[in-house]
UniProtKB/Swiss-Prot annotation:
Listed Pfam families: Bac_luciferase
Reaction(s) catalysed by this chain's protein: an alkanesulfonate + FMNH2 + O2 = an aldehyde + FMN + sulfite + H2O + 2 H(+)
Gene of this entry: ssuD
Protein name: Alkanesulfonate monooxygenase
UniProt KW keywords: Flavoprotein, FMN, Monooxygenase, Oxidoreductase
Enzyme nomenclature, EC number: 1.14.14.5
Length: 384
């Protein structure tokens, strides 16, 4: 089981929908979160993309020297940059980071934002363009290891004599990750992607996605891995966890929720539509927002994209993770508010349950020990 964390380049806070409890989203803070994730034993970090975020490539590049083993899941944007430029960026990053790059292919689901960035294309056209883009991108990086060139004549993109002089460390290219819930998105995943990402829907819905994509990939003679994107609120007791879930949205008012839901409704993203359907745009009670045991839809009231959280004590959260893992999920990309403190909390409480075979995560060897007791004794590993 792989566990990733998240760099909050679109802001961070103790509460959703208010400036109260917010903290500066700057390099010093991003670095703190990245170093924490690296030190605690997370396998990688996701950096979000879009106009609401700092640029993912610039931020990720700045964090390379601050980290030792952490992998970076960074977006390429078909239609907003060329496949050749994106391939060069990926190869350079992979080389400078020592092979620590993962690529998140983001087609985009907000037409207004995309048009603001200069891309005027409907939903299916964007996915057709993504298909052309990935054919060129993959070939450029693969051919770079043999000093080859690429010619491609697609419906939306063409390349003639395309060449990449400096190959990436990873062969044939940094692994491709991708998420999308429409049939067009599933076809892209089956054709090109190494790891398909789903947002945190209930297990039955996730299982249905996995089955469809596996079947499509098998028809093409391919196998695909799967990951899931979730928030997490884990505490020593279930009562504490639900109390903090309620606290996270305690500053939300109906107007803020309505404005957020109106913005999401204008998108043509099937995934965003499915997220919104989980809560219906209404605040509701804890019972109404708990859409499956320990799966809470409160975050999605005002946050676009991933809108559900695992909520509970360590054993409950670990049990839900194992339930998803039994469906085929290998990677969990998690986040929590605020991201620095929650990275420690999750690692301390849940890693011993889901990473028990990994000594680096499972418990103290050379440390950490906690504060020395009585100036001469190390604390016990557990207190009863």
């Amino acid at each position: 089981m792989n566990v990733f964390w998240f760099i909050p380049t679109h802001g961070d806070s103790r509460y959703l929908g208010t400036a109260e409890g917010a903290r500066a989203a700057d390099y010093d803070y991003f670095r703190q979160v990245a170093v924490a994730a690296d030190t605690l034993g997370y396998d990688g970090v996701l950096l979000p993309t879009g106009r609401s975020c700092e640029d993912a490539w610039v931020v990720a590049s700045s964090l390379i020297p601050a980290t030792k083993r952490l992998k970076f899941l960074v977006a390429i944007r078909p239609g907003l940059s060329s496949p050749g430029l994106s391939a060069r960026m990926a190869s350079t990053f992979d080389r400078l980071s020592g092979g620590r790059l993962l690529i998140n292919v983001v087609t985009g689901g907000d037409s207004a934002e995309l048009e603001g960035d200069g891309l005027f294309a409907d939903h299916d056209t964007r996915y057709a363009l993504t298909d052309d883009f990935l054919h060129i991108w993959r070939k450029l990086l693969a051919e770079s290891h043999e000093n080859g060139s690429v010619d491609f004549d697609g419906e939306h993109l063409r390349a003639k004599g395309g060449k990449l002089l400096y190959p990436p460390i990873q062969h044939p290219h940094p692994p491709l990750w991708f998420g999308g819930s429409s049939p067009a998105a599933h076809a892209i995943a089956a054709d090109h992607i190494e790891t398909y990402l789903t947002w945190g829907e209930p297990p039955a819905a996730v299982a249905k996605k996995i089955a469809d994509i596996r079947a499509r990939a098998a028809e093409r003679g391919r196998e695909i891995r799967f990951g899931i994107r979730l928030h997490v609120i884990v505490r020593e007791t279930e009562e504490e966890a639900w109390r903090d879930a309620d606290r996270l949205i305690s500053r939300l008012d109906d107007d803020t929720i309505a404005r957020a839901q109106q913005a999401f409704a204008k998108m043509d993203s099937e995934g965003q539509r499915r997220m919104a359907a989980l809560h219906g745009g209404k605040r509701g009670s804890r019972q109404e927002l708990e859409i499956y045991p320990n799966l809470w839809a409160g975050v999605g009231l005002v946050r676009g994209g991933a809108g559900t959280a695992l909520v509970g004590n360590p054993e409950q959260v670990a049990a839900r993770m194992r339930e998803y893992a039994a469906l085929g999920i290998e990677t969990f990309i998690l986040s929590g508010y605020p991201h620095l403190e929650e990275s420690y909390r999750f690692a301390e409480l849940v890693f011993p349950l889901v990473k028990g075979g990994d000594a680096r995560r499972a418990g103290p060897l050379s440390g950490p020990f906690g504060e020395v007791v009585g100036n001469g004794y190390l604390p016990k590993v557990s207190q009863s």
